[in-house]
């Protein structure tokens, strides 16, 4: 029946696309990890609400993107397992009275297993929903990276230079370097999510078994697959060619009182006062000084300590310099590089910890690559066996005809 044949062909096509997409995702992961490895000492401002928050490193931030993509790879791997199931032999939906061997066709076509219930086999499209859901998640992660590239390449941020092959000019403005490719990735994330919503809406409330509505599902699948694979490929090239403006990045870590959290932490560690109290003191200090100090590390630590003492007297009735806080500790708290070194807990931005993560992620990446390759080779062996079976049958038919 066309019902089980079409379902089988869609699954074969999709499993091939999933295997190809997994390769591209791993290329992008490797590009991010390598770019991080080149910049473990590159200081950058970290943001919350797009406001200066705490200092981190470029490597730490790009490893965050790589980790998100590692989860995307895992989801694609799971989607492959649910896709690579064989519906062939289900016929229209009630199977057949002929003595077919469904297990044999399942094996020869490279499927992991068969969809046993013949009605489920022809009417289910949940594997498509799952796959496009994975694509949507992946594209959402790519859109965050794309948005970052777009922002960081603006004149206002000016942190990076996007490779020339991924920007376009203007028909009338000679100076323009528009990050069009990143913008298209950002936009296509919405398109892929739209494909998911369309397929969910089509499949909702469909009665068993087959309905022609399902014909409308496949175009959304192919569009989502094409957009996702192309976006990953383009992003890989863009990441590889990014040029960092390290001086500008580091300069941005010196403004906006980005060391405020570490100063509050230092006060707590040195004096044992409650963090809420330290937070209140440093918050007041930030309100007074954030517009005056263009370079935090140039601020005189003795001046900062005196002002902290004044604020502490108003808040708790004692000077913090009398209960453990020193000028040296204040100076160290205001030092951005020192801030980073202290954050050496698991997953933190300290160099030693980031290098450990990079090493571990490379190992994970190699392992994931092997997992994908095993699946691809299994399919190839099955199809080779199928080709041999067909060749053998042809010889038998030829002999019988003679």
Q: Whereabouts are the PLM-identified features?
A:
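Glycine-rich cofactor-pocket loops
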Residues: 37-59, 160-176, 207-214, 240-254
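A helix-coil-helix interface module used to build multimeric assemblies
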Residues: 1-86, 95, 100-102, 106, ...
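A structural signal for small-residue-enriched, beta-sheet-centric alpha/beta enzyme cores
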Residues: 2, 115-119, 256, 264
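Flexible, glycine/charged-enriched surface loops at secondary-structure junctions
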Residues: 42, 46, 79-85, 152-156, ...
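Alpha-helical coiled-coil oligomerization motifs
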Residues: 33, 37-40, 81-84, 150, ...
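Glycine-rich cofactor/substrate-binding loops
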Residues: 173-402
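Internal glycine-rich alpha/beta core junctions
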Residues: 23-26, 30, 54-205, 222
């Amino acid at each position: 029946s066309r019902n089980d044949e079409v379902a089988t062909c869609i699954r074969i096509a999709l499993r091939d696309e999933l295997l190809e997409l997994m390769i591209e995702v791993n290329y992008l992961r490797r590009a991010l990890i390598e770019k991080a490895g080149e910049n473990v000492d590159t200081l950058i401002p970290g943001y919350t609400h797009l406001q200066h928050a705490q200092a981190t490193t470029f490597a730490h931030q790009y490893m965050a993107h790589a980790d998100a993509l590692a989860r995307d790879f895992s989801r694609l791997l799971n989607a492959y397992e649910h896709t690579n199931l064989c519906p062939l032999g289900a016929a229209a939906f009630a199977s057949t009275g002929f003595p077919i061997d469904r297990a044999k066709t399942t094996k020869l076509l490279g499927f992991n297993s068969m969809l046993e219930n013949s009605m489920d086999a022809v009417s289910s499209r949940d594997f498509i929903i799952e796959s496009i859901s994975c694509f949507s998640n992946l594209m959402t992660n790519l859109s965050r990276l794309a948005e970052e590239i777009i922002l960081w390449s603006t004149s206002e941020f000016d942190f990076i230079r996007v490779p020339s092959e991924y920007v376009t000019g203007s028909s009338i403005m000679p100076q323009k370097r528009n990050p069009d490719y990143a913008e298209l990735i950002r936009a296509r994330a919405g398109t892929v999510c739209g494909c998911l919503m369309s397929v969910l809406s089509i499949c909702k409330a469909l009665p068993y078994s087959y309905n022609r509505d399902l014909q409308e599902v496949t175009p959304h699948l192919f569009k989502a697959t094409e957009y996702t694979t192309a976006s990953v490929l383009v992003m890989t090239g863009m990441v590889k060619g990014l040029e960092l403006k390290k001086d500008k990045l580091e300069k941005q870590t010196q403004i906006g009182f980005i060391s405020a959290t570490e100063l509050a932490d230092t006060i707590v560690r040195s004096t044992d006062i409650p963090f809420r109290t330290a937070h209140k003191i440093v918050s007041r200090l930030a309100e007074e000084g954030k517009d005056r100090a263009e370079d935090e590390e140039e601020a005189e630590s003795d001046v900062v300590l005196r002002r902290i003492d004044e604020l502490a007297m108003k808040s708790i009735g004692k000077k913090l310099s009398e209960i453990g806080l020193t000028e040296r500790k204040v100076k160290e708290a205001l030092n951005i590089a020192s801030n980073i070194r202290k954050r050496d807990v698991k997953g933190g931005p300290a160099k030693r910890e980031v290098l450990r993560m990079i090493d571990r992620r490379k190992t994970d990446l190699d392992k994931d690559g092997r997992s994908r390759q095993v699946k691809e080779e299994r399919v190839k062996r099955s199809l080779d066996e199928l080709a041999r079976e067909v060749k053998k049958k042809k010889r038998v038919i030829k002999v019988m005809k003679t």
